[in-house]
Amino acid sequence: MSAKLKKLSDLSKRGPHRVLEGDLGYTGLPGKVYTPAEGKNLPGVAFGHDWLKDVAAYEDTLRHLASWGIAVAAPDTETGFKPDHAGLAADLETAMQILGGVRLGNGNISVSPGKLGIVGHGMGGGAAVLAAVDNPKAKAVAAVYPANVAPSAVEAARNLFVPGMVVGPGEDGDSLFDPGNPAKLAYNWAGEVVYRAPKKGDQQSFSEDNMVKRILGLGKSDRGLQETVRGLLVGYLLHQLDEDKAYASYSEPDAEGSGVESLTGEKLTKAAGLARDNASFSLF
C-alpha cells in the first residue's frame, strides 16, 4: 500500500511563523532573503528562478517556506534572455553558503550549516542539480519542473547522490511545450529520489507573474498548483533537512496525496521516454 502524504492540505497553507524579508545584496549577491522572525539552527535553502523570471515572481512561495521555518536565499541573477546556467548554479552555491555562515535578523536567527538544500524552478531546477553535484553542503535538492540547462542537468544527475524530489508532469500532463524532461532527470538520479506529479500541472503555471505571462502568451499562473507544490516542498524539506519524522512520507517514492500522483518503476521509465518496446521479434 502506498504511503499517504499526510497533512498536505495544511502544509499548502501559510505556516505559523511571522516572516522577515531582507536584502541579499548586502553580501554582494543581488537577491532576497526570507526567514522566520526568529529561530536557531533552522533549515535553509537557496532558490533558483526560471528563465526570464526574477525573485518577485516567487515571493509568495518564498514567504510560504519561511512561514514554515525554512530560511530562503534567492539570487536575483541571470535574469536575461541568454543566462549563464553554470553562473546561476554558482550563485545558488554562494547563497547556500551565505545562509549557513551569516547570522540573520538582529542576531536571533541562525541557519544550521548541516541543514542546507537547494530548490529551483524551471531553469533554476536544472541549475539546482548542477550546484548540488559533488557539493557536501547540499543535503537535499528539490527541482520543480526542471528545464534543460547547459551543462546538462539530466546527465549531471547520474553523479548526484544527494536525496532529491522532482516535481513534473504526470500521466495526464501535456509536456509538449515544457523545456525539459523532469522524468528523465529523476530516472537518472543516482541517489534516492521521489517524483511527484500534481494533477494537470505544468512548468508554466508555477511562477506567480501572471500579468507577464498573459502579455507574452506563456499561459497563466495556477494558484491551486502553486499551493500544492508549496506543500510538497515544505513536507520534503522539513523531513530531509530538519529530520522531522512527522513528514517522513514525503520522502517515500510511492507516496500519494489529494491531487498528487507519484511515478516509480515502469511509469517513471515511460514518462522519461525510455520505455522498452516489448513487441515480439520478427524478420518480416
Where are these regions (language model features)?
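N-terminal cap/lid segment of alpha/beta-hydrolase-fold proteins
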Residues: 1-40
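Short beta-strand element of the alpha/beta-hydrolase
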Residues: 41-50
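Alpha/beta-hydrolase active-site loop
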Residues: 57, 83-114, 126, 130-133, ...
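Alpha/beta-hydrolase-fold serine-hydrolase catalytic core, especially in secreted/extracellular enzymes
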Residues: 200, 209-284
